[in-house]
Each structure stands twice: as structure tokens, then as C-alpha cells.
């Protein structure tokens, strides 16, 4: 632990990692209000799940989720949003444990075969994670890796009955 003196003249204790971050990237440590004495920071990038933009009239794309109970939910979304962001933004049961970094398989979806070929080929990282997914099918993909586009307007994806978080070795 190191002691530092803030701009306001307060003494604070910070870890060696925080001190290194402060020296190399001072913009990472920012004051959130003028009254707080803490300098919050995070070593992971901020993700904006749940903050979806409303599509402009005429630019809406549609996606239908087939839920675990068989019911269907259709949403109008913007181009460029990932299926993971859309699901989480509408409080659907999709964990996304890794935050969309393609490091787990908890956003596994089963794509309707009519739309599967319109998707870009999965990258090696996605294929590696899909190999660990519970209930893998020929049209399985990771929701964090599929961005909405006009090519897949109207896509239908099913949420599998279970997902497996390989990082925690548990089931949800």
C-alpha cells in the first residue's frame, strides 16, 4: 500500500496496482463528485448492457427470441446492437457472464436455420467457446458475437434450456 496526497490535500492509501495505473494512465482514475474522497476505478471496460437506443422510424430491425418456455418475444432494435445487449436490455434470461468478451458460453443462442447462413462465419474464439456450450446445435452461436444488420432483419433465436458458465464450472 502506498500513501498519496490528492489534489484537495487529502491523504489516501492505494495499492501498488492503483499507483501504477495512476502513473501510466491518470485518466483512469477520476473523481465522480466534488464531495467524495474516493477515486473509483475499474480495470475492466464499461459495458452498456440494458441501455438500448430506440431505433429511428424506418430504420428498425426486428428480432424474435424464443424463450425457454416456448413463448416468443419480438423487439424492434437498432443496427449494430448485439443479441446479448438486446436480451439483457429487455431483461431476458441471458447471463453473458464475461460481459460480451467471448470468454464464456452463457449467451449461447440457437439461430433459426433460415437466418444462420446470413450470419458472418464465427471466429476461432467463438468456436472454442461454443465447443463448451450446453446443448450445442448445428446453428448455435454466441449472442455477444452477433450484431444486428439488415442482412438478418427478422432473425429468430431460441434460448437453450440451460447454459454452462465454464469459468465457474456451474450450471444456470
UniProtKB/Swiss-Prot annotation:
Coiled coil: none annotated. [2Fe-2S] cluster binds at residues 98, 104, 107, 144. Its main location: mitochondrion. Signal peptide: none annotated. Keywords: 2Fe-2S, Electron transport, Iron, Iron-sulfur, Metal-binding, Mitochondrion, Transit peptide, Transport. Its cofactor is [2Fe-2S] cluster. It holds the Pfam family Fer2. Binds 1 [2Fe-2S] cluster. The keyword Mitochondrion applies. It is found in: Mitochondrion matrix. InterPro entries: 2Fe-2S_ferredoxin-like_sf, 2Fe-2S_ferredoxin-type, Adrenodoxin-like, Adrenodoxin_Fe-S_BS, Beta-grasp_dom_sf. One of its GO terms (cellular component) is iron-sulfur cluster assembly complex. One of its GO terms (biological process) is P450-containing electron transport chain. Transmembrane segments: none annotated. GO terms for molecular function: 2 iron, 2 sulfur cluster binding; electron transfer activity; iron-sulfur cluster binding; metal ion binding; oxidoreductase activity, acting on NAD(P)H, heme protein as acceptor. Residues 61-163 form the 2Fe-2S ferredoxin-type domain. Residues 1-16 form a transit peptide. Belongs to the adrenodoxin/putidaredoxin family. Iron-sulfur protein that transfers electrons in a wide variety of metabolic reactions. Involved in heme A biosynthesis and in iron-sulfur cluster assembly. Transfers electrons from adrenodoxin reductase ARH1 to heme A synthase COX15, a heme protein that catalyzes the conversion of heme O to heme A. Required for the de novo synthesis of Fe-S clusters on iron sulfur cluster assembly protein ISU1. Interact in its reduced state with ISU1 to productively deliver electrons for Fe-S cluster synthesis. Essential for coenzyme Q biosynthesis. Present with 14800 molecules/cell in log phase SD medium. This is Adrenodoxin homolog, mitochondrial. It comes from Saccharomyces cerevisiae (strain ATCC 204508 / S288c) (Baker's yeast). The gene is YAH1.
